[in-house]
């Protein structure tokens, strides 16, 4: 008799995606981050659901409702900190996942990669709106500064900003709609993640060598299910260490002060995972130029498929490209550091140089290095 998992319409889908899926036999731990992102998403939706039961999206009570969650709700403090630090873990996994895709040439799976870029944008939008909800000083001023960037768009900018605000400033209407969007977007992200997987399973996974592994596939279960469980345990352990020992390590002390439109914090900055893009935005003196650079810093990922000049897919056997990749990683870390610093000398010039290097590496140096690699191998 045929196994039910192979015949039942619903179980057949699960079977083909997670059990009998042929996977390359040589994929390393860098391939764990996809499943970890799935776990992060489920965790964020669950903790967020319980937070939404006690949160009120109103400027008068939002801050005190978050305080109430932490003080009066049973285990509310752990749910709140798991949600806040879960976002940080989410972005750590996202950056690792994207980095692995760049290093091993996964961007040649065009549809999978572009859905991934859309997922990144959606996750960034969700995180930004979530940061605005506690209605502390940094929530309010972060919302004001970032939404105000849209006013740089010619002709329609000012109208667009007021339309998003629901008035002439960030107020009750803004908070209410941000809560609505913050609630719905994770479900859209979950749907997009399914599309992402659908496209991935059309081609099969990439491997460290970048060579087709059709001739050497192994079943996903038990080999990679066990590997994913190990990754999940390490992720949860890391998250709980953060939540239980230093829950406010990655937050901003200013957000423990209720929002006050009459008092601007001395240094407005977003959460740590947006600092690299924020540094690129600030490094350009022109408002519209800064906004374009900010969007391009992420959108440039979808250009990778067009500027891949190497005859090899992966960077595994391309030492020059490897060097440039790790310089790019160092550059992003530098930008992250600069984004958290005040706008003064020498941080301004460091930020500008790091921003120029970021775009030069991706658009010029990496394609040139790939071409040199081809010539050295007489391809």
Swiss-Prot record:
<dbReference type="GO" id="GO:0045275">
    <property type="term" value="C:respiratory chain complex III"/>
</dbReference>
<feature type="binding site" description="axial binding residue">
    <location>
        <position position="196"/>
    </location>
    <ligand>
        <name>heme b b566</name>
    </ligand>
</feature>
<keyword id="KW-0472">Membrane</keyword>
<feature type="transmembrane region" description="Helical">
    <location>
        <begin position="288"/>
        <end position="308"/>
    </location>
</feature>
<keyword id="KW-0830">Ubiquinone</keyword>
<feature type="transmembrane region" description="Helical">
    <location>
        <begin position="178"/>
        <end position="198"/>
    </location>
</feature>
<keyword id="KW-0249">Electron transport</keyword>
<feature type="transmembrane region" description="Helical">
    <location>
        <begin position="113"/>
        <end position="133"/>
    </location>
</feature>
<feature type="transmembrane region" description="Helical">
    <location>
        <begin position="77"/>
        <end position="98"/>
    </location>
</feature>
<keyword id="KW-0349">Heme</keyword>
<dbReference type="InterPro" id="IPR048260">
    <property type="entry name" value="Cytochrome_b_C_euk/bac"/>
</dbReference>
<dbReference type="InterPro" id="IPR016174">
    <property type="entry name" value="Di-haem_cyt_TM"/>
</dbReference>
<protein>
    <recommendedName>
        <fullName>Cytochrome b</fullName>
    </recommendedName>
</protein>
<keyword id="KW-0408">Iron</keyword>
<feature type="transmembrane region" description="Helical">
    <location>
        <begin position="320"/>
        <end position="340"/>
    </location>
</feature>
<dbReference type="InterPro" id="IPR036150">
    <property type="entry name" value="Cyt_b/b6_C_sf"/>
</dbReference>
<keyword id="KW-1133">Transmembrane helix</keyword>
<feature type="binding site" description="axial binding residue">
    <location>
        <position position="182"/>
    </location>
    <ligand>
        <name>heme b b562</name>
    </ligand>
</feature>
<dbReference type="GO" id="GO:0006122">
    <property type="term" value="P:mitochondrial electron transport, ubiquinol to cytochrome c"/>
</dbReference>
<dbReference type="Pfam" id="PF00033">
    <property type="entry name" value="Cytochrome_B"/>
</dbReference>
<dbReference type="GO" id="GO:0005743">
    <property type="term" value="C:mitochondrial inner membrane"/>
</dbReference>
<dbReference type="GO" id="GO:0046872">
    <property type="term" value="F:metal ion binding"/>
</dbReference>
<dbReference type="InterPro" id="IPR005797">
    <property type="entry name" value="Cyt_b/b6_N"/>
</dbReference>
<feature type="transmembrane region" description="Helical">
    <location>
        <begin position="347"/>
        <end position="367"/>
    </location>
</feature>
<comment type="subunit">
    <text>The cytochrome bc1 complex contains 11 subunits: 3 respiratory subunits (MT-CYB, CYC1 and UQCRFS1), 2 core proteins (UQCRC1 and UQCRC2) and 6 low-molecular weight proteins (UQCRH/QCR6, UQCRB/QCR7, UQCRQ/QCR8, UQCR10/QCR9, UQCR11/QCR10 and a cleavage product of UQCRFS1). This cytochrome bc1 complex then forms a dimer.</text>
</comment>
<feature type="binding site" description="axial binding residue">
    <location>
        <position position="97"/>
    </location>
    <ligand>
        <name>heme b b566</name>
    </ligand>
</feature>
<feature type="transmembrane region" description="Helical">
    <location>
        <begin position="226"/>
        <end position="246"/>
    </location>
</feature>
<keyword id="KW-0812">Transmembrane</keyword>
<keyword id="KW-0479">Metal-binding</keyword>
<dbReference type="InterPro" id="IPR030689">
    <property type="entry name" value="Cytochrome_b"/>
</dbReference>
<keyword id="KW-0679">Respiratory chain</keyword>
<comment type="function">
    <text>Component of the ubiquinol-cytochrome c reductase complex (complex III or cytochrome b-c1 complex) that is part of the mitochondrial respiratory chain. The b-c1 complex mediates electron transfer from ubiquinol to cytochrome c. Contributes to the generation of a proton gradient across the mitochondrial membrane that is then used for ATP synthesis.</text>
</comment>
<dbReference type="InterPro" id="IPR048259">
    <property type="entry name" value="Cytochrome_b_N_euk/bac"/>
</dbReference>
<comment type="similarity">
    <text>Belongs to the cytochrome b family.</text>
</comment>
<dbReference type="InterPro" id="IPR005798">
    <property type="entry name" value="Cyt_b/b6_C"/>
</dbReference>
<feature type="transmembrane region" description="Helical">
    <location>
        <begin position="33"/>
        <end position="53"/>
    </location>
</feature>
<keyword id="KW-0813">Transport</keyword>
<keyword id="KW-0999">Mitochondrion inner membrane</keyword>
<dbReference type="InterPro" id="IPR027387">
    <property type="entry name" value="Cytb/b6-like_sf"/>
</dbReference>
<feature type="binding site" description="axial binding residue">
    <location>
        <position position="83"/>
    </location>
    <ligand>
        <name>heme b b562</name>
    </ligand>
</feature>
<dbReference type="GO" id="GO:0008121">
    <property type="term" value="F:ubiquinol-cytochrome-c reductase activity"/>
</dbReference>
<keyword id="KW-0496">Mitochondrion</keyword>
């Amino acid at each position: 008799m045929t196994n039910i998992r192979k015949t039942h319409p619903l179980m057949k889908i699960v079977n083909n995606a997670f059990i009998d899926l042929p996977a390359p036999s040589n994929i390393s731990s860098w391939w764990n981050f996809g499943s970890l992102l799935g776990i992060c998403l489920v965790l964020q939706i669950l903790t967020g659901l319980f937070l939404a039961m006690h949160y009120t999206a109103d400027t008068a009570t939002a801050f005190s409702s978050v305080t109430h969650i932490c003080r009066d709700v049973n285990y509310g403090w752990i749910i709140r900190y798991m949600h806040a630090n879960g976002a940080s873990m989410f972005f750590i996994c996202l950056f690792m996942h994207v980095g692995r895709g760049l290093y091993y040439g996964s961007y040649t799976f065009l549809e999978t990669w572009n859905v991934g870029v859309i997922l990144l944008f959606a996750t960034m939008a969700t995180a930004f709106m979530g940061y605005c909800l506690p209605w502390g000083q940094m929530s309010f001023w972060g919302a004001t500064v970032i939404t105000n960037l849209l006013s740089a768009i010619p002709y329609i900018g000012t109208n667009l900003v007021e339309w998003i605000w629901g008035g002439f400033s960030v107020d009750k209407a803004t908070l209410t709609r941000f809560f609505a969007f913050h609630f719905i977007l994770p479900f859209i992200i979950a749907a997009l993640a399914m599309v992402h997987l659908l496209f991935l399973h059309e081609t099969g996974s990439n491997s460290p060598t970048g060579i087709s592994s059709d001739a050497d596939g192994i079943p996903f279960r038990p080999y990679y299910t066990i590997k994913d469980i190990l990754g999940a345990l390490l992720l949860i352990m890391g998250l709980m260490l953060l939540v239980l020992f230093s829950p406010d390590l990655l937050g901003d002390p200013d957000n423990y002060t209720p929002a006050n439109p009459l008092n601007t914090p001395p240094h407005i900055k977003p959460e740590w995972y947006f600092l690299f893009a924020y540094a690129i935005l600030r490094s350009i003196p022109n408002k519209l130029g800064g906004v374009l650079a900010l969007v391009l810093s992420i959108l440039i990922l979808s250009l990778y498929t067009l500027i891949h000049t190497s005859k090899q897919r992966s960077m595994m056997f391309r030492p020059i490209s490897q060097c440039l990749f790790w310089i790019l990683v160092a550059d992003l870390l530098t930008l992250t550091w600069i984004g958290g610093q005040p706008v003064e000398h020498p941080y301004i010039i460091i930020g500008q140089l790091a921003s120029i290097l970021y775009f030069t590496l991706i658009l010029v140096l990496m394609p040139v290095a790939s071409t040199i690699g081809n010539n050295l191998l007489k391809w």
